[in-house]
């Protein structure tokens, strides 16, 4: 699959699928795939961020994120294509898996 910016209808379809397969909460905000995760405490939030960081580094695809205590707010976009790509949805799915494991 070619890495490219997704068209609006492709984004909507992938977003619907993501929110069906994963927990609800993913949305498009400021042309980025966004969600805020809430964890039991800071330790669990940081554990989640660590798993995501290690995976993202291997994929060479890094999230924009912000952490306060037990909350992690995430925005995903593909800077190299100036928009949302399949890489963002793939990373979002992996983040859902990591969130369930902490």
UniProtKB/Swiss-Prot annotation:
Instruction: Give a yes or no for keyword Protein biosynthesis in this entry.
Output: no
Q: Select a single GO molecular function from the record's annotations and give it.
A: 4-alpha-hydroxytetrahydrobiopterin dehydratase activity
Q: Does the keyword Transferase apply?
A: no
Q: Give the CDD domains listed for this entry.
A: PCD_DCoH_subfamily_b
Keywords from the UniProt entry: Lyase
Superkingdom of the source species: Bacteria
Question: What reaction does this enzyme carry out catalytically?
Answer: (4aS,6R)-4a-hydroxy-L-erythro-5,6,7,8-tetrahydrobiopterin = (6R)-L-erythro-6,7-dihydrobiopterin + H2O
Q: Which Gene3D superfamilies is this protein grouped with?
A: Transcriptional coactivator/pterin dehydratase
Q: Which residues cross the membrane?
A: none
Q: What is its EC number?
A: 4.2.1.96
Residues making up the signal peptide according to the UniProt record: none
> What biological processes does GO assign it?
tetrahydrobiopterin biosynthetic process
What family is it from?
A: Belongs to the pterin-4-alpha-carbinolamine dehydratase family.
Record protein name field? Putative pterin-4-alpha-carbinolamine dehydratase
């Amino acid at each position: 699959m070619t890495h490219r910016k997704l068209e609006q209808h492709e984004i909507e379809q992938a977003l619907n699928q993501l929110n069906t397969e994963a927990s609800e909460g993913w949305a498009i905000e400021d042309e980025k795939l966004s969600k805020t995760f809430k964890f039991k405490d800071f330790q669990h939030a940081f554990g989640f961020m660590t798993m995501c960081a290690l995976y993202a580094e291997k994929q060479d695809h890094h999230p924009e994120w912000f952490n306060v205590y037990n909350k992690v707010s995430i925005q995903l976009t593909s800077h190299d294509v100036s928009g949302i790509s399949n890489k963002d949805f793939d990373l979002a799915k992996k983040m859902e898996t990591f969130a369930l494991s902490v």
